[in-house]
């Protein structure tokens, strides 16, 4: 039995003083350490030197997660979403970032009106750490955790696990005390030098539970999937292999999940958006599906990806590769001369992409600047380009008519050398073909959501709710500081009112600052089982249908819509998918946020690696926020 277990056994019989415990159990230091840990966990209490088990009662406090830890304070995020609580260092009780805790609010905070409190219990400790191994004068090894670098955690004797000073490592807390200085850890995994962006990115993925490698049983299922399409499956699909269908992606894309076909008609346009039919291969009850649900999204950073599906599917049998027969889920739309959808239908199809289009090449073709060899590659589908341009212009007019938000944001593209070292950062350019594909995908997404809502299907919607009034007030104050008098008719502005402000600053020095401020006033889009519309796009109906290789919500509605197309209706459809839609919405929202943070932190490592080669140089920049 451990020393902690022995202490608990003694205290179960009666309260004890330290002297009595050490006489019975020996080893004064171990008894003291066990008592400190039991007190920090809220199991034992001490009063006037007498130790006793706490009575069976729930500790007081608000359920929270510790989200920030500095040397002398921390911040706890309330589970109810009512803001963050400041916790002074002496009141942290050794809590670490990621710990689920209870925090009791002070009746008299030092700052009137603020939320301050103390940790009363650690209900679910997070004992995993990622950080850098350092050595202090005297030779003792410590971990400087990435999430709280000021709070050094001592390594237990022999706990380095072969790691060297300066390495990025994963570690586990092996001992917790009431103070952070009492904690001890041991290295569980060595990534490599903290000077390497690649190794730091690996550590970040690990800390966010993003694994580029699949479990063996999942990999085995993927490897067992036949690459051919059974004739029995081909027989009941709409065969579109004779249509001039093609894909458009970046040159390096390997997981191609969308293709288009388009032609002008007497009354307008016929647009087909053809999406990889992942739901045919990833079935309920399989390990592939369980793993896809757990991941919920692919994570992209630098030149790497941690995929939602094994490459046998994502880059292979599901990917709409040029010249290969593929199963697809198609949205076939009829649009009028103004680009408005008049009708649509969804169908399980069999397609063959004529060409793997590349954004940069198609932009050149549309501009009339492409070389002849490039034009030859696209000769089978180039007849569709005129209709693409016409429909896109009509759709842009439709977007403006409904006052969809047009926020200008810039995204960096990392340039890596052959060794994987970042040697440049460029602004990612968006040409007209990128905008076209985005608009055509949006149409298919809107049609899918319209079907879900009007047919009352259990569903996963992409929801963007209207801005929070408090955030709008902050925006108004920021705009006033920029000399812009924002006068909204109601507490929440309309898309048109916000659009007028964006138009006012477009092309000026204030453009980026105002765009950023407006963006931050918005709610975060998420996935929900109820249709609530999309504020930013100014749409009543919206879902994600077009990327099932890399997003689980898309795969979810493919599965639901497939059963609906097969004739499943009413109570049976609800029985199969009502809870599934709720679970998929929650999981997809959580993992999307996690993926965004992972990607941002990983790419920051590469940007820092690039800037290290420019120490001492001067650059211009913008303040993007104050924390």
Regions found by a protein language model. Name each.
Residues 109, 118, 201-204, 221-225, ...:
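Charged, low-complexity, helix-prone segments enriched in Lys/Glu/Asp/Gln
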Residues 114, 119, 341, 420-422, ...:
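A broad structural signal for short, well-ordered beta-strand segments within beta-sheet-rich domains
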């Amino acid at each position: 039995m451990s020393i902690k277990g022995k202490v608990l056994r003694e205290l179960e019989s009666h309260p004890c003083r330290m002297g009595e415990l050490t006489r019975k159990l020996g080893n004064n230091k171990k008894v003291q350490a066990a008592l400190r840990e039991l007190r920090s966990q809220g199991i034992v209490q001490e009063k006037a030197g007498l130790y006793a088990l706490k009575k069976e009662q729930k500790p007081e406090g608000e359920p929270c997660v510790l989200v920030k830890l500095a040397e002398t304070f921390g911040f706890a995020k309330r589970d109810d979403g009512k803001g963050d609580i400041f916790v002074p260092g002496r009141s942290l009780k050794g809590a670490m970032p990621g710990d689920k805790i209870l925090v009791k609010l002070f009746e008299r905070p030092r700052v009137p009106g603020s939320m301050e409190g103390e940790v009363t219990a650690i209900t679910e400790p997070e004992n995993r750490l990622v950080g850098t191994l350092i050595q202090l004068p005297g030779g003792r090894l410590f971990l400087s955790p990435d999430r709280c670098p000021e709070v050094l955690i001592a390594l237990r004797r022999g706990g380095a696990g072969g790691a060297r000073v300066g390495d990025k490592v994963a570690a586990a807390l092996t001992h917790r005390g009431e103070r952070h200085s009492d904690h001890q850890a041991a290295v569980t995994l060595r990534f490599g030098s903290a000077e390497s962006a690649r190794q730091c990115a690996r550590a970040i993925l690990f800390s966010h539970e993003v694994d580029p490698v699949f479990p063996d049983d999942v990999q085995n299922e993927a490897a067992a999937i036949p690459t051919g399409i059974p004739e029995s499956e081909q027989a009941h699909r709409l065969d579109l292999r004779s249509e001039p269908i093609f894909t458009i992606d970046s040159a390096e894309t390997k997981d191609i999940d969308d293709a288009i076909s388009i032609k002008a008609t007497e009354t307008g346009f016929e647009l087909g958006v053809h999406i990889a039919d992942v739901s045919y291969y990833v079935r309920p009850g399989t390990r592939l599906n369980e793993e896809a649900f757990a991941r919920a999204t692919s994570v992209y950073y630098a030149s790497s990806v941690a995929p939602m599906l094994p490459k046998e599917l994502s880059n292979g049998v599901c990917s709409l590769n040029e010249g290969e027969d593929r199963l697809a889920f198609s949205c076939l739309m009829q649009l009028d001369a103004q680009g408005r959808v008049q009708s649509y239908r969804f169908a399980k199809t069999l397609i063959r992409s004529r060409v793997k289009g590349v954004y940069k090449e198609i932009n050149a073709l549309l501009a009339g600047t492409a070389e002849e060899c490039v034009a030859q590659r696209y000769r089978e589908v180039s007849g569709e380009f005129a209709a693409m341009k016409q429909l896109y212009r009509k759709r842009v007019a439709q977007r403006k008519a409904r006052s969809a938000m047009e926020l200008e944001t810039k995204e960096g593209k990392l340039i890596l050398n052959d060794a994987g070292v970042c040697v440049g950062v460029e602004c990612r350019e968006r040409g007209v073909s990128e905008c076209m594909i985005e608009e055509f995908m949006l149409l298919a997404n809107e049609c899918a959501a319209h079907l879900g809502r009007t047919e009352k299907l259990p569903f996963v919607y992409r929801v963007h709710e209207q801005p929070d009034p408090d955030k709008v007030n902050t925006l108004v104050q920021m705009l006033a500081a920029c000399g812009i008098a924002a006068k909204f008719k109601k507490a929440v502005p309309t898309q048109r009112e916000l659009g007028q402000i964006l138009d006012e600053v477009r092309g000026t020095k204030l453009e980026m600052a105002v765009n950023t401020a407006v963006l931050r006033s918005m709610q975060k889009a998420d996935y929900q089982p109820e249709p609530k519309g999309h504020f930013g796009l100014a749409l009543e109906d919206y879902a994600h249908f077009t990327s099932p290789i890399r997003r689980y919500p898309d795969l979810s509605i493919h599965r639901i819509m497939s059963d609906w197309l097969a004739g499943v209706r009413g109570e049976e459809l609800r029985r199969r998918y009502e809870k599934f839609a709720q679970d998929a919405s929650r999981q997809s929202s959580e993992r999307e946020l996690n993926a965004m943070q992972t990607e941002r932190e990983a790419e920051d490592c590469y940007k820092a690696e690039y800037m290290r080669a420019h120490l001492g140089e001067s650059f211009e920049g913008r303040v993007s926020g104050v924390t």
